């Protein structure tokens, strides 16, 4: 079966996708962050970071909650635009 998996690629099962979605909902519930609060947090982070780092692509910032073994994590992916250095 592994030969077929490598040949055609193994797709993620719907049960795994459903489990991940449920974990996301549970983490959001435990931390008490609503989707509106997450969007406000993303907007606030974008504004503050753009003030100090002009090469931030504010529209591409992603904020997610991750469930850890003993601690939940707030993860922010902040892509930076590449700029040329002038010396």
Swiss-Prot record:
**Keyword Transit peptide (UniProt):** no
User: What GO terms describe the biological role, i.e. biological process, of this protein?
Assistant: cell division; regulation of division septum assembly
The superkingdom listed in its UniProt entry is Bacteria
Does this entry carry the keyword Cell division? yes
Pfam families named in the record: MinE (PF03776)
Enumerate the UniProt keywords alphabetically.
Answer: Cell cycle, Cell division
Family named by the database record: Belongs to the MinE family.
Q: What does this protein do?
A: Prevents the cell division inhibition by proteins MinC and MinD at internal division sites while permitting inhibition at polar sites. This ensures cell division at the proper site by restricting the formation of a division septum at the midpoint of the long axis of the cell.
Protein known as: Cell division topological specificity factor
